Amino acid sequence: QSFGFEMITVPMTPTGPDMDLVEQLVKDPAVKGMWCVPKYSNPDGIIYSDETVHRIANMKPAAKDFMLMWDNAYCVHEFDGDFVPFEDILTLCREAGNPDMVFEFASTSKITFPGAGISVMACSEANQAYMQKLMGIQMISYDKVNELRHVLYLKDKETTLALMKKHAQVLAP
């Protein structure tokens, strides 16, 4: 809102955002984007269904500069049970003819240390070229020592998921 955006609240269903409403809203060229937390979405912990993810990827927004911000903040946060995989939004958007519509984000800040984690962004090659221009003037270098700490500590998917189980033991009532 600080940037002049009017935020539109879309009700959640057990399978994700109300896609009938979303599909109506994106017909308006004034609607410029959508922010999604597809896994364990706050406050209810909803995981978007495959059908919902497919519908999002296949949207045809009226705004040519529409951006889908895919905030994968909780991608490995299985405290109970097994890892819950879900559809790859980048591939689905590309297959739907929307390769430049989506930016996917994640970080380790809710895994290792809040505010000191490392972040990742995934997007199309065209969006990557654009973002590299923007980021190139904003930073001299990444914190390579912190990146190394994370690589050595987290190692791989299995180690990371095991760490999340340890977090669950601490956080459980």
What are these regions (language model features)?
Residues 1-37, 54:
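PLP-dependent aspartate aminotransferase-fold enzymes
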Residues 8-9, 41-44, 162-167:
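Surface-exposed cleft-lining segments at the edges of enzyme active sites
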Residues 9, 68-70, 150:
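Hydrophobic residues in well-ordered beta-strands that form the structural core
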Residues 11, 38, 72, 106, ...:
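Active-site proximal loops enriched in glycine and acidic residues that flank catalytic Cys/His/Asp
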Residues 19-29, 41, 46-68, 72-114:
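Active-site pre-lysine segment of PLP-dependent enzymes
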Residues 32-37, 69, 120-122:
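Structural motif
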Residues 35-41, 158-159:
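Short glycine/proline-rich turn/loop motifs
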Residues 91-172:
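Conserved core segment of the aminotransferase class I/II
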